[in-house]
Amino acid sequence: MAALLLGAVLLVAQPQLVPSRPAELGQQELLRKAGTLQDDVRDGVAPNGSAQQLPQTIIIGVRKGGTRALLEMLSLHPDVAAAENEVHFFDWEEHYSHGLGWYLSQMPFSWPHQLTVEKTPAYFTSPKVPERVYSMNPSIRLLLILRDPSERVLSDYTQVFYNHMQKHKPYPSIEEFLVRDGRLNVDYKALNRSLYHVHMQNWLRFFPLRHIHIVDGDRLIRDPFPEIQKVERFLKLSPQINASNFYFNKTKGFYCLRDSGRDRCLHESKGRAHPQVDPKLLNKLHEYFHEPNKKFFELVGRTFDWH
C-alpha cells in the first residue's frame, strides 16, 4: 500500500511538466490533489485506477476528421485510459488560466502502466496551442487524424447545420458560405481549417515530425484495423486490438466496435449524409486545395488519396 501511495504522489507531482504561466497555481493544485488521492487510496475509494495522470498522448485534431472514432477505437486497448470529454485546456483562456492542477482533474483515474489520452480537435488549428503543449511536456506523443480537405469542409458545415436544426434555427445553405461575389469565399472558417500545411507548420516549430503520428481518416473509416495497428506501434503499446474488434454495420454504413462481447457504434450524429453540392462548385473546392495539399505532402513526407 505504501508503494501504491508513493506511486500515486509521483504520478501527479511532476514539476518538469508545469508550464511557465500557470506554474504556481498548477504546482499547488497538483500537491493538493496528491494529498486527496492519498486519502482516497487509503480509504479504498479511488475509482478505475490509482491516480489521475497528465496525458502522455493528445489527439490534437482535426475537427470533423474522425477524432471521436479514433479515441473510441483506441479505448479498446486495456492500457489506454481516455478522457471522456473534450477538455479545451490549451485553447480556452478560461480553462488554461486554472493551471495544470485543473487539467489534471479532468483526466480519468488510471493505473501507472496505462497511457492517458485526451482529445480536443480544436488544438490543431489554434496558433497558441503548440507552445503551450510543449511547455507542459516536450516529449509528448501527438495524434493527428486527417481526411480529404474538401470532405472535411462539407462535414464541418453539416455539423453546424444540424446543430441549428435541432434548435429550430434557420441556417444558410452551404453555397452561401462557399461562394461570395461569384468566387470561392476563402474567408469561410471551414476552408481555413482544411489548410493543413498552415497549421502543421505551427506544430513543427515545437515538435519534431517523429512525435506526431498522422492517421489517415479516410482509411480509418474504410478499414480501421490497419490504421489502429499503426497507432499502437507509434504509442509503443502491445498489440492488443484485433480485427475481431471491428464489424461493419450495414444499417449505419460504417464500422462499429465489439469489446468483450458487447457491440457499440458511434453516436447517430456521426456519418451523416453531406449536403448535395453543385459539381462545378465541388470542383472549385478541389482546385482550391490542390496546391495546399501538395505543400502538406512535402511537409510530412507522405501523400494521401485526396482530390
Swiss-Prot record:
EC number(s) given by UniProt: 2.8.2.23
Tissue expression profile of the protein: Highly expressed in the brain and kidney and weakly expressed in the heart, lung and placenta.
Disulphide linkage map: C256-C265
Transmembrane regions: none
InterPro entries, sorted: NST/OST, P-loop_NTPase, Sulfotransferase_dom
Residue numbers binding 3'-phosphoadenylyl sulfate: K64, G65, G66, T67, R68, R147, S155, Y255, K270, G271, R272, A273, H274
Catalytically driven reaction(s): alpha-D-glucosaminyl-[heparan sulfate](n) + 3'-phosphoadenylyl sulfate = 3-sulfo-alpha-D-glucosaminyl-[heparan sulfate](n) + adenosine 3',5'-bisphosphate + H(+)
Keyword tRNA processing part of the UniProt annotation: no
Signal peptide interval: 1-20
RNA-binding in keyword set: no
GO MF, one annotated term: sulfotransferase activity
Pfam families per UniProt: Sulfotransfer_1 (PF00685)
Localization in the cell: Golgi apparatus lumen
Keyword annotations: Disulfide bond, Glycoprotein, Golgi apparatus, Signal, Transferase
Any single Gene Ontology cellular-component annotation: Golgi lumen
Glycosylated sites: N48, N192, N242, N249
A biological process from GO: glycosaminoglycan biosynthetic process
Predominant subcellular localization, coarse grouping: Golgi
Role according to the record: Sulfotransferase that utilizes 3'-phospho-5'-adenylyl sulfate (PAPS) to catalyze the transfer of a sulfo group to position 3 of glucosamine residues in heparan. Catalyzes the rate limiting step in the biosynthesis of heparan sulfate (HSact). This modification is a crucial step in the biosynthesis of anticoagulant heparan sulfate as it completes the structure of the antithrombin pentasaccharide binding site.
Family according to the record: Belongs to the sulfotransferase 1 family.
Official protein name in the record: Heparan sulfate glucosamine 3-O-sulfotransferase 1
Species assigned in the record: Homo sapiens
Record gene name: HS3ST1
